[in-house]
């Protein structure tokens, strides 16, 4: 049990021991050779499954769904960094589990136990299980919610049943109809209103460069490490309490999907590409294209990575453009910098056309993990910017800063190219991060640099909107990734109603960030693990407000999945 401590931590171990006794007794009923073979196979599978889940949780703070294996090819590119996240104790534990399995095989008695003895063992184990259940603390509402998403049943048997078998056997048309009705009811009550305000249409007709600033945490943006980004944030609209919650499995693509469509990845174990045939006519690229813009997505990696070659056009982009198609050597040093899209003439002409309005999406990679000399981009960044070598006591932070500076170079060159093409006055630059620095191995140092009061606040990341003629503005309202779509639509004078998120400038929107586990953050409090874990200074939250926010959270999470499942925006 991941969240237990003290005496309650023993109960899950006893429960596991009971099941081990039952399984051992049942296997003992088989003939000697069959029992030995089956016991070994089951033991190996259990050990491998346990180690995979433990390692996955160590890195991502969540358990693995079977559908997550669809990302296996994409994650293989960073496999060389995997072992840096696993402690010595992890490997000692793995070796110990294997040793126990070997000993169990060697020490198995030659004589087969009687059936009566086996039944006694099973009866005793079940009795022990009942006693364990009886001793469970009365206040188990949070534990219950944990058991709904964790454990062998939820991550294996339920995974296969709910995400493979049920979709093939159920009446999907009836379910989709019901889901659409529930989404409509939710959006009519809680969705974006589309009302106008002082910011409506202030950026109408301008070009857009939307930049996903991969892995850029808020504490990394300083005048020293990112002078250009700092200036853009200070001179534009800066959202100081913008949160990027994890939904689904892949943090980067989850945020990428949300900032384009206004919908988070599904939380029910389905892979977001299962919805590639959905109608995303309400996405940002689709809406801008409907208003006469071109829209393309740019990134260094191949189209197969995160299935962007399929998903980006599905979301509304004309095409996904890979930098690798513009170089003879996909491992060339020139691809180490995000600025390649501006130094390559053909790519630059696609990114910054002068003959028609554009909405272009750039996915950066410079600040991506890992952070050390073993990473080619990290070594390149530190060689280019050696002044960061001893900036912090944590070596990871030093490489992180050097890689952030490479990203800052992209923004600096972007401003220069826009000015040279006489596009600067008519182009909006938007910077949004996909997630905080959760991939750093030294998470204690991340907490210290983030200066947070509770861990959920780590999810706060940079977000800004800049235009040359814009008055500087700092927005402190709590907001999240799904709010970006209706906010931008309002700024560009387009209808922003009917979205899961809200126009941040809407005075009736109080602001919140809802997380896939039911946690939430508002301007008043941080709610996690079934209670308010932090109250912001000079703010209070009543029990009535907590109950109302919990009810909203439950409906929000359901509506997010239902929008995708029902293909809600299909006309």
Question: Where are the model-predicted features located?
Answer:
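Low-complexity, intrinsically disordered regions enriched in charged/polar residues
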Residues: 66-72, 140, 146-159, 163, ...
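Proteins with a high burden of low-complexity, intrinsically disordered sequence enriched in S/T/G/P/A and R
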Residues: 2, 11, 61-64, 128-170, ...
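A diffuse structural propensity rather than consistent per-protein peaks
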Residues: 53-68, 87-88, 169-179, 252, ...
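Membrane-interface segments at or immediately adjacent to transmembrane helices
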Residues: 78, 132-210
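Generic detector of well-ordered alpha-helical segments enriched in charged/polar residues
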Residues: 11-18, 73-76, 80, 92-96, ...
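Transmembrane and membrane-interface helices of multi-pass
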Residues: 1-162
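Solvent-exposed soluble domains appended to multi-pass membrane proteins
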Residues: 185-571
């Amino acid at each position: 049990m991941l969240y237990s401590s003290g005496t309650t931590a023993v109960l899950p171990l006893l429960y596991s021991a009971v099941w081990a006794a039952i399984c051992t007794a049942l296997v003992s009923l088989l003939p000697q050779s069959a029992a030995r073979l089956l016991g070994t196979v089951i033991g190996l599978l259990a050990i491998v499954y346990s180690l995979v889940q433990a390692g996955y949780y160590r890195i991502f703070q969540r358990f693995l769904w079977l559908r997550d294996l669809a990302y296996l090819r994409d994650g293989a590119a960073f496999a060389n960094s995997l072992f840096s996240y696993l402690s010595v104790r992890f490997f000692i534990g793995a070796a110990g589990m294997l040793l126990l399995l070997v000993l169990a095989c060697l020490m198995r008695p030659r004589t087969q136990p009687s059936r009566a003895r086996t039944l006694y063992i099973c009866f005793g184990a079940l009795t022990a299980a009942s006693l364990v259940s009886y001793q469970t603390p009365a206040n188990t509402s949070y534990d219950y919610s944990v058991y709904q998403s964790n454990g062998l049943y939820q991550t294996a048997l339920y995974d296969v049943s709910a995400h493979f078998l049920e979709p093939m056997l159920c009446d999907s048309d009836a379910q989709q109809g019901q889901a659409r009705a529930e989404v409509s009811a939710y959006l009519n009550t809680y969705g974006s209103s589309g009302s106008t305000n002082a910011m409506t249409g202030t950026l109408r007709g301008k070009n857009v460069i939307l930049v996903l600033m991969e892995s850029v945490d808020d504490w990394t943006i300083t005048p020293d490490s990112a002078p250009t980004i700092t200036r853009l944030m200070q001179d534009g609209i800066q959202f100081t309490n913008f949160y990027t919650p994890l939904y689904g499995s892949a943090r980067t693509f989850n945020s990428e999907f949300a900032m384009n469509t206004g919908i988070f990845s599904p939380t029910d174990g389905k892979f977001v590409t299962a919805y590639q045939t959905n109608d995303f006519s309400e996405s940002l690229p689709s809406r801008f294209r409907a208003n006469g813009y071109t829209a393309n997505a740019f990134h260094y990696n191949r189209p197969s990575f995160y299935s962007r070659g399929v998903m980006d056009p599905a979301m509304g982009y004309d095409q996904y453009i890979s930098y690798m198609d513009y170089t003879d050597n996909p491992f060339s040093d020139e691809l180490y910098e995000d600025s390649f899209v501006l130094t390559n003439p053909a790519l630059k002409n696609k990114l910054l056309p002068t003959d028609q309005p554009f909405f272009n999406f750039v996915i950066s990679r410079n600040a991506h993990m890992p952070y050390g000399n073993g990473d080619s981009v990290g070594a390149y960044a530190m060689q280019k910017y050696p002044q960061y070598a001893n900036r912090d006591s944590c070596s990871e932070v030093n490489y992180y800063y050097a890689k952030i500076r490479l990203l800052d170079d992209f923004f600096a060159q972007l401003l220069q190219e826009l000015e040279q093409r006489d596009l600067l006055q008519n182009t909006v630059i938007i910077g949004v991060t996909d997630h905080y620095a959760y991939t750093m191995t030294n998470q204690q140092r991340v907490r210290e640099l983030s200066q947070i009061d509770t861990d959920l606040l780590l999810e706060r990341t940079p977000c800004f909107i800049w235009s040359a003629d814009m008055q500087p503005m700092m927005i402190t309202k709590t907001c999240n990734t799904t709010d970006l779509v209706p906010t931008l639509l309002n700024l560009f004078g387009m209808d922003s109603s009917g979205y899961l998120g809200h126009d941040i400038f809407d005075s009736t929107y109080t602001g919140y960030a809802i997380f896939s586990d039911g946690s939430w953050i508002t301007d008043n409090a941080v709610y996690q693990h079934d209670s308010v874990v932090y109250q912001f200074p000079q703010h209070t939250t009543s029990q009535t407000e907590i109950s109302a926010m919990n009810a909203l959270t439950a409906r929000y999470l359901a509506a997010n999945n239902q929008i995708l499942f029902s293909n809600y925006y299909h006309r």
